[in-house]
Swiss-Prot record:
Essential for male fertility. Required for sperm flagellum biogenesis. Also required for acrosome biogenesis. Required for the attachment of developing acrosomes to the nucleus during spermiogenesis and may be involved in the transport of fibrous sheath components. Interacts with CCDC42, CFAP53, IFT88 and ODF2. Interacts with CCDC146. Interacts with TEKT3. Interacts with ubiquitinated histone H2A. InterPro entries: CFAP_domain-containing, DUF4200. Its main location: cytoplasm. One of its GO terms (biological process) is sperm flagellum assembly. This is Coiled-coil domain-containing protein 38. It comes from the Eukaryota. Pfam families: DUF4200. One of its GO terms (cellular component) is centrosome. It is found in: Cytoplasm, Cytoskeleton, Microtubule organizing center, Centrosome; Cytoplasm, Perinuclear region; Cell projection, Cilium, Flagellum; Cytoplasm, Cytoskeleton. The gene is CCDC38. It comes from Macaca fascicularis (Crab-eating macaque).
Length: 563
C-alpha cells in the first residue's frame, strides 16, 4: 500500500507545502487539543440537521447506531501507544470498515484510490501529530529545565538577598550604635563647651568688674593727685623716672615734649624746654658712652622743677603723669596723710566753685540784659527800615501817578489841539468841561466852597482830596479794605449780571417782535428769477469809510475823557 500511495505526494508537492508553511504569518499552537471536541460538535450538528430533514421511517435511534458501530471496539491500531483508538485521528470509521472487509467485497478502482487517499491522510495526520507531540515534549522538557534553572537562581537570589538583609541589618545596627555614641560624644562636648563658655563669661565679667574698679580707683587716684601740690607731683614723676633707669632716656624726652605742648602759649618756657630736651639727649649719649647718667638726671630734674613751678597749674599735672608706657612698679603714694587735710582742700575748692558760680550768674544776667538791649535796638532798626521802605514805595507810587497824570494832560492837550476846531466849538467844550468839573467837585467836597473858584482850582482841590482819601485808605486796616473791595466787586458783578439779563431780554423781545412781524406780514411771492447784471461795477462809497472811522474814534475819546 505504501507503494501505491507514493505517487500521490512527490517532491514538488512537499516543497510547495513547505513554502506555504514558511509564507504563513502565524503559527498554530495547541489546536489539535480541541480537534476531537470540535469534530464531535460538528458531527452532532450535521446529524441533527440530517435528522431534521429526514423522514420518520428513515430516522434511527442511538442504540441501533451503537450496535452498528460495535464491531469497531475490536479494532486497535498501534497498541504500543497505550491502546489509543483511531477515531479521534481520522475522519470516520467508514473507510476503516471498508478497508477491513478485505478482498471479500468487490470494489472499484475509484473506491480503492479513495481508500488509499484516506489511508495516506491518516498516516500523514498521525505523523504530524507525533512530530507535534515530540516538539511539545521537547518544549516542555526545555521549559522544565528553564524553570528549574530559574527556580535555582531564584533560590540563590533569595539566599543572597537574605544575606544582604542580614548584612544591612547588621550595618544599620552598627550605624545606630555609632550615631548614638557620636550623639553622646557631641552632647558631652556641648556640655563641656557650655561649661567652658560659662567659665569664660564668668572670667570676663570678673575682668570687667575689676577693670571698672580699677578705673574708679584710678579716677580717685588722679583726683587726689590733682588735689596735691604741684611740686609734690613733680617729685613723684621724677622718682618714677629715676626708678626705671633703662627707660630714662625715653621717658624724660616724652615728659619734656608734654611740657612743651602744654606750655606752647608761653614762648619763653618753650625755649627753656628745648634746652632741657637737648640736655636729656646729651645725657643719654654720655650715659651710653661713659655710663654716668645720675648727674645729668639731677640737673634736668632741677630744671624741670624750676620751670614747672613757674608755668604749670593743677589742671596740667594729670596729663603730665598719665602716660601708658610708664611703669608703675612703685607703690602709689598719697600726699594727704589725714582726711582733715583733704577735707580742707575740698572746702577751699567748694568756696572757689561758689564764687565762680556767683560770677557766672552775674555774667549771665549782664549777658541777658545786653541781649535784650540788642534785641530792642534791632527791632527799632528793623521798624525804621520797614518804614523807610514803605516811604520809598509810596514815593515811587506818587512818581508813577504824577507821570501818568502828566501823560494824560499831554494827551488832553493833543486832543484839544487835534483837528481844525473853531472858537465856538472850543467855548462849548470848555463850558461842558467846567460843568462836569463842578459836578465832580460837589460830589467830592460839597457846595460850601464853591464860591469864586475856577475849574482848575476845583480840580486842584479834588486832587488834594483824593490824595487825602488815598492816605486814609492806607491807614485803614487791610481786612476792612478787602471787605469793601469784595462788596464793590459784588456790586459790579451784580450790575453786570443785571445788564446782561436786560440785554438778553431785549434780544428776546427783538426776536419775538421780528417773529410777530414775520408772522403778520404777507408772504412774498416769487415771480421768477431775479434780474442781475452780467458784471456788477464796484460801489462808489469808499470815501465814506474813513469818515465813519473818524466819528467812531471821536465818540470813543469823548466817552473816555468826559464820562
Amino acid at each position: 500500500m505504501s507503494s501505491n500511495l507514493s505517487p500521490t505526494l512527490n517532491s514538488g508537492d512537499k516543497v510547495k507545502d513547505g513554502s506555504i508553511k514558511e509564507d504563513r504569518p502565524y503559527k498554530i499552537f495547541f489546536r489539535d487539543l480541541f480537534l476531537f471536541k470540535e469534530n464531535e460538535m460538528e458531527a452532532k450538528k450535521t446529524e441533527k440537521l440530517m435528522n431534521h430533514n429526514m423522514k420518520v421511517y428513515q430516522k434511527t435511534t442511538f442504540s441501533s447506531r451503537m450496535k452498528s458501530r460495535s464491531y469497531l471496539s475490536q479494532l486497535a491500531f498501534y497498541p504500543k501507544r497505550g491502546g489509543r483508538s483511531f477515531e479521534k485521528f481520522g475522519p470516520g470509521p467508514a473507510p476503516i470498515s471498508r478497508f477491513l472487509e478485505g478482498s471479500d467485497t468487490k470494489r472499484t478502482v475509484h473506491e480503492f484510490i479513495n481508500d488509499q487517499r484516506d489511508r495516506f491522510l491518516l498516516e500523514y495526520a498521525l505523523s504530524t501529530k507525533r512530530n507535534t507531540i515530540k516538539k511539545f515534549e521537547k518544549d516542555i522538557a526545555m521549559r522544565e529545565r528553564q524553570l528549574k534553572k530559574a527556580e535555582k537562581k531564584l533560590q540563590d537570589d533569595a539566599l543572597a538577598f537574605e544575606e544582604f538583609l542580614r548584612e544591612n541589618d547588621q550595618r544599620s545596627v552598627d550605624a545606630l550604635k555609632l550615631a548614638a555614641q557620636e550623639t553622646i560624644n557631641k552632647l558631652q562636648m556641648t556640655a563641656e563647651l557650655k561649661k567652658a563658655s560659662m567659665e569664660v563669661q564668668a572670667v570676663k565679667s570678673e575682668i570687667a568688674k575689676t577693670e571698672f574698679l580699677l578705673k574708679e580707683y584710678m579716677k580717685y587716684g588722679f583726683f587726689l593727685l590733682q588735689l596735691s601740690p604741684k611740686h609734690w607731683q613733680i617729685q613723684q614723676a621724677l622718682k618714677r623716672a629715676q626708678a626705671s633707669k633703662s627707660k630714662a632716656n625715653i621717658i624724660l624726652p616724652k615728659i619734656l615734649a608734654r611740657l612743651s605742648l602744654h606750655s606752647s602759649k608761653k614762648e619763653g618756657i618753650l625755649e627753656e624746654f628745648g634746652g632741657t630736651a637737648i640736655l636729656s639727649e646729651d645725657a643719654s649719649r654720655e650715659r651710653d658712652s661713659q655710663g654716668k647718667p645720675s648727674r645729668i638726671l639731677t640737673r634736668t630734674s632741677e630744671k624741670i622743677k624750676s620751670n614747672l613751678t613757674e608755668s604749670f597749674g593743677s589742671e596740667d599735672s594729670l596729663e603730665f603723669l598719665l602716660d601708658d608706657e610708664m611703669d608703675f612698679d612703685l607703690e602709689p603714694a598719697l600726699y594727704f596723710k589725714e582726711p582733715e587735710e583733704l577735707l580742707q582742700v575740698l572746702r577751699e575748692l567748694e568756696e572757689q566753685n561758689l564764687t565762680l558760680f556767683q560770677y557766672s550768674q552775674d555774667v549771665d544776667e549782664n549777658l541777658e540784659e545786653v541781649n535784650k538791649r540788642e534785641k530792642v535796638i534791632q527791632d527799632k532798626t528793623n521798624s525804621n527800615i520797614e518804614f523807610l521802605l514803605e516811604q520809598e514805595e509810596m514815593l515811587k507810587a506818587n512818581c508813577v501817578r504824577e507821570e501818568e497824570k502828566a501823560a494824560e494832560l499831554q494827551l488832553r492837550s493833543r486832543l484839544f489841539s487835534f483837528g481844525e476846531f473853531n472858537s465856538d466849538a472850543q467855548e462849548i467844550l470848555i463850558d461842558s468841561l467846567s460843568k462836569k468839573i463842578t459836578e465832580v467837585y460837589k460830589v467830592c467836597i460839597g457846595d460850601a466852597e464853591d464860591d469864586g473858584l475856577n475849574p482848575i482850582q476845583k480840580l486842584v482841590k479834588v486832587e488834594s482830596r483824593l490824595v487825602e482819601l488815598c492816605d486814609l485808605i492806607e491807614s485803614i486796616p487791610r481786612e476792612n479794605v478787602e471787605a469793601i473791595e469784595r462788596m464793590k466787586q459784588k456790586e459790579r458783578r451784580q450790575k453786570f449780571r443785571d445788564e446782561k439779563m436786560r440785554e438778553k431780554q431785549r434780544h428776546q423781545e427783538e426776536r419775538l417782535k421780528a417773529a410777530l412781524e414775520k408772522a403778520v406780514a404777507q408772504p412774498k411771492k416769487k415771480l421768477g428769477r431775479r434780474l442781475v447784471y452780467h458784471s456788477k461795477p464796484p460801489s462808489a462809497n469808499k470815501q465814506q469809510l474813513p469818515l465813519v472811522n473818524e466819528t467812531k474814534t471821536k465818540a470813543q475819546e469823548e466817552e473816555y475823557f468826559f464820562t
